[in-house]
Structures are given as structure tokens and as C-alpha cells.
Amino acid sequence: MRLSECIKGQTLIIKNNNIQDLKLKKYTMDIGLINNTLLKIIKSSNPIILKCRNCNLCISKDIAYDIICEAI
């Protein structure tokens, strides 16, 4: 399952050096806001793991950046 498919209606957990644990839900945030938030975190210098809670998708920073840019 692609990250863009997970974002729609799913909960995506973003762990940034185990310091941040953001839960982004489609029902509480506009899809554009989710994309912008992901872009800001992905562009940061810290290592990042994107993981979808429902399908256990883990994706690397570079791949995630490509997919998010494509989604926008």
C-alpha cells in the first residue's frame, strides 16, 4: 500500500528521533495540511520514520518526500 493511500482516512504515525509522535487524522486535518506538515518534518535534518498504524507501512525519508510531492 502506498503512503498516499494510507493517508486517506487512516492514522499515520510520524516518529522523529523518538522525540515527536504526531498522529494525523483525515477527520481532524485537511489533506493539504497533512501534506504540508509531512513536508516540514521530512525536510528537517533529523532521521524520520513514517509508519501507518493500520497497514504497518514503513517508508524512508527520500521515498516519502517523492510521494508527498507527487500527492501535492
Where are these regions (language model features)?
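Absolute protein N-terminus
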Residues: 1-2
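A generic structural motif
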Residues: 7, 18, 42-45
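C-terminal structural segments of small proteins and small subunits
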Residues: 42, 46-72
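A structural micro-motif recognizing beta-strand termini
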Residues: 17-19, 29-31
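Short alpha-helix capping/helix-loop boundary micro-motifs
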Residues: 23-27
